[in-house]
Every structure is written in structure tokens, then in C-alpha cells.
């Protein structure tokens, strides 16, 4: 269980490192190429491996007398000892035993496989890309694949997803383009894979949050079957939303070990340079998490605040450069976060006038009922059954938590008032 969790979440954390690392390479005017990411990823494992071999005495130095007066040093590597050190402690019989906790992980992986099958099949049913969002991304990714950078000559914006639009999603896809024979296949396949990976990362976040594998598995099932969570539509929000779960997982782990703040900050920064709108959504998520923890533990839980502020500062590796190049107001205008009226006044549009999927306004039934057809980018609604479960959950929450609190509050002050009335009557 812990072995699977460690390796699967390492994969999620690694995904969260790529966008901000790519932004750093771009800022330093280094090429965004797959082998450089691989080299940087192997530095620490290779260092740890050699450090382990040296400390364990698996490399022995022998002094051999040469023909001259001096001695030559010959290093002998004990390959048999290395093999025994690595594999000697592994009890292969125990590996075949499946623990109860491992069954939950395997069930979650079945959900992942099913979701990936659906998303991958749907992505390749059409021989073309969906709409302008997909073509905008593929145009910018192709430019980055050829020129190894997200910077364009002057202030030219080749597509609507060129800078100052955050390049996190395109950085990841550029690396995958470079190692794939077909750009078309890479974009569709890996985008569907990103959507499906949310199942894995959400399960471990939910397990960490609830400290209950059964609740985590049920919550993962609900997320997997919700039609409106994510689709195979190609846009940067897919990666940004996916990274929420590794970020929240690391933030929760930082309560036990402060070292987890490092990946927390890195992943939060990557979210902030992947999709502008989704970056704004992150603040309420972290705020709700902080408030819930405050109520439950009566502690400030500063780790959540540190992760948010640290990620914001680290994201300035990209945003700071963009604000210098285009000015703060210019970036907001280009990203259509503000709208210019009369050439001078800028008023907030996207943040104050929130629309639903496909820029349409949601009606009440859009949240409950799921149509047999989708919008061009994402389905609507959570379904009738889940809506009933949500209603039941809200009623249960009010009955179990809100009602006792209010009742206790009323009784406390009603007794206080009755005592004061009694004293006045006595007087």
C-alpha cells in the first residue's frame, strides 16, 4: 500500500514540477528539451545511489605496487554485494500476499483504467481537434517544439495561448511532442491520460484528508462517474485541475513533516502558471481547507498559508517577467481578464461575470440533470442520483453539526436570561 502510494504520488508530484521548472529554464534562456528535464530528474537519484554505495562499503580501494616507487589505487566494485543489498532484503513471498489496504488501491486503479478507456476512446473518435482552444494549444506547442522556448520575437502572440498566457500545459505537451512520432496522437492520448490520472491522485488526497480508505474509495468513485468533472477536451484547465490533488496531498502531509512544504509550494506555483482562471479558483479551495482545519483543530494551520504564499512568490518566475514585458494592466487585457472600454477604462469581466460551460449561463436544472449530449468542451450537471446524495449530505450536516451547535448556543443564553429574570423578580 505504502509502496504504491509513494510511487504513484511521486509521479503526481513530478508532473507538478514540470511547469515551473520549464518556466525557470525559459527565464534563464535555456532550451526546453526532454533530455534536459530527464538529466535534471536523474541528478538526485544518481547522487543518492553513489552515496549509498560509498557508505555501505561496496566499493573497496586496494593499493597495488607499480613498477615505480609509488603505489596505484585500484577501486573494486562488489557487484554481488550491491545486488544482495538491493534485493537481498526483499521477501518475494510477502510480495504475493495482498493486504486489505492494497485492495482499495487496486480498486481505485480499476476505476482509473475504466476512465482512461472511456476518455481515450472518445478522444480518437474524431479525426480532428475540437475547436479553437485545441488548435491554439497545438500551434503554440508546435512552435515550442521547433524553437525550444515559449518566447516569441518582440511582443508577437502567435496564438491566443502564446505568452503572456501561462505556458504550464504547453511546456508539458512540448516535452511529449519531442518524444512522439505523431503530434496528433501525443496531444489526444496524453490529454486523456491527464484526465484519468485525477482518479489516482484524488484517492490518495481523500485518504490523507479523511484518514479512511473506505470513504476515500467511495469519494473517488463519485468523482470518476461525475460527467461534469473533466472531459477529453484539450485545454490547459485539464492539467491545472489535475494538479490540485497532489498539491492538497502535499499540504496535508506537511502537517506531519515540514519538508512536504517544498513540493507543496512548487505544485501551487505550477498551477498558477498553467491556467489563469483555474489559478483564481485555487484561492477559495485553500481558504475552505484552512477554515475547515481551523474549526476542526482550533489551530491556525499556517502550512496552508505558507504553501499558498510560497507558490505565489515562486510563480513570479513567469509572471514577474510577463509584467515587466507587457505591464500588469497589459497582461490582464491580453488574457481578457479585464475589458477595455473606450480605449481607457478597464473593468473586470471574467471574474465578476462568471458563465458556465461554453460561456452559457447555468440554470438550476443544469446542475442536477445530465443531458445525453455534451457541450463542446465539457458536460454539464452531476446527475439526479448524486444530486439526491448531495441534498441528503447537506441535511445530515445541518442535523449533526449545525443544529446541535445552534441548540446549545440558544440553551446557554436562554438559561442566562432566565437567571437574570429570576434575580430581577427576587429584587
Predicted regions and their residues:
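Perimembrane helix-loop-helix junctions
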Residues: 282-309
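Membrane-interface transmembrane helices that cradle and orient dolichyl/undecaprenyl
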Residues: 208, 244-261, 271
